[in-house]
């Protein structure tokens, strides 16, 4: 390798500085890969390349990593900082030998044998000039821009045409100390290291570029030849009394309507546009958990992303983040309502495939869609779909639609060999631009049909949207899930492939709820969501600034010291910082008087802010319920609090998709923290410390509307033990409207009929609609709910339930 200060390398670096734009994956290798700055470090690259090392040099300088041009000097042994598996590929003739690099491995291993305290980190580094996976019939482009083993001439063309799309990916470091101790230090180990590294680089390339893209028409013909589609076409022809040719043409029309037409060129253009858009809209995108997903890709998993659905921005945000995290944007299941010009064709070329809201018993369409989905899985394309079926209008997760999850499980049952893994994804925003529209729809206004004019209208409103949040939850590998749910599933399916297993529908429902729970497990507690939670729990949606900051400090401490899950993310900074962020985004108002500053939510903004509160209310609902028990009882035991929480938790779990694994432990940890913070005191019983009553009342306020709903339900059940589920749902909704009108409750979810349906289903599951005469459980929970309400609210509920027009 020429010297760092040689004229040739200086010239090369100057040229690349102007032609090359490099994206680093991950953005912070020290933090994401746990690199140790105190230990020696060497880089491992697949192929010796001056241009690759020049690009790496630029990045290492910015990141504070050792330069690849600086030799590695350890205990008097001098070795190159970069170890390559292959020599350069010349324009003609044979590739240069890699023996010098293997000798470097040997020297480094030998030093470890002599120095037991030494531990060099070997960091694999992959460089990609463009990320085009290529097409099945794209031979000319592959010949000109062959990426894996280019000659210097091809590399020059790649830098010229693809230099603005250069990616440098760092991987987890390998400990040479571990290798030397476990496997020895001879030449055989050096060769083994090289072989393992080659496999790593091959897998890494597939993660970065994805599988080869199919020719769309060729794929259609291949799908139409499948046994299941041939059978579906024959049945369509017989049932509709048409020819098989006509039925086949219908199937082709369905395929054309459904199938994506992924274009790498469009993705590159979209990447530039979206970079501009995110920089204009957001002050930052916070990402948590991407490394575990990269590893799943690397290990050969078929990945299915299942995000929550807040906004049309979701389609763009997740694909963009995955692209910049070194993964291929997924094929996205989009509603057919988004297939309008010009967005539809663009979405399709960006990887969207379109699905009808309902298949309406259309067996041919179902067969076509199922076969297409199977093909995506078989070819190794990652897939994304929204299990809620539509965007949440309240900020809470919607009950899942199970159709796509059922189809995914059926694909596994039909014999996908690779592990298929669902990845729950929490998407959050400091500002959702559709929130105002959502509340109009909830108040009865008809939903507008998507069109190009809506797009232009949205663009006009672009402004400072704060920050976005992408948190990857705990993955669910379907083969493992099936082993847990139905241990003999492989045998059952093999014995009778056409027979639907009796356990399948319950398993799909369990899986769908588990996905939603793990989405909520990965929630992002941000400045906007936390501040909304506090202010909406106050009497007039207003607090003195110092009190608001103090309450936020308490919530931050609670989330950090008693974490909801390890996948949850918490805003950086203290309460003062969070309030300032909210004010800068104009989400809250501030008024000064001689006694200080008051932060409030304007009356016309209060309903909108419930959306952001609802994103994270599940994180605080148990602490809030605990606070409600404490503030409504002068003295109360831990056992009594745990009993109340345990009674309400099944309903909270169903309503808010909660997944606390050890409820008693969690309750005790929250109580211990409240005692440690000086808010609660404990002798034989627990009581609120008088000077901190206001803080405890604020914490208790977040659960008040939920308790009011439960009080309505259990007062009705206790008063009319034999009422039907449908009656309970309709009368609960009617009573909620009355309560809201009398007591000023404006939260949209309070009047959501679907929520009362969810609760009634859970109540039936728990046995509250049984024919048993003993209703002590219902009466106990009714009394508990009533005891935690304000007297005026309790009186309204009790009086309304016993009134003639209700019964």
UniProtKB/Swiss-Prot annotation:
Belongs to the GPAT/DAPAT family. It is found in: Cell inner membrane. One of its GO terms (cellular component) is plasma membrane. It is a peripheral membrane protein. Its EC number is 2.3.1.15. HAMAP family: Glyc3P_acyltrans. GO terms for molecular function: glycerol-3-phosphate O-acyltransferase activity. InterPro entries: GPAT/DHAPAT, GPAT/DHAPAT_C, GPAT/DHAPAT_LPLAT, GPAT_PlsB, Plipid/glycerol_acylTrfase. One of its GO terms (biological process) is CDP-diacylglycerol biosynthetic process. The HXXXXD motif is essential for acyltransferase activity and may constitute the binding site for the phosphate moiety of the glycerol-3-phosphate. It is an enzyme of class 2 (transferase). This is Glycerol-3-phosphate acyltransferase. Keywords: Acyltransferase, Cell inner membrane, Cell membrane, Lipid biosynthesis, Lipid metabolism, Membrane, Phospholipid biosynthesis, Phospholipid metabolism, Transferase. It comes from Shewanella sp. (strain ANA-3). Its main location: membrane. Pathway: Phospholipid metabolism; CDP-diacylglycerol biosynthesis; CDP-diacylglycerol from sn-glycerol 3-phosphate: step 1/3. The keyword Calcium does not apply. It catalyses: sn-glycerol 3-phosphate + an acyl-CoA = a 1-acyl-sn-glycero-3-phosphate + CoA.
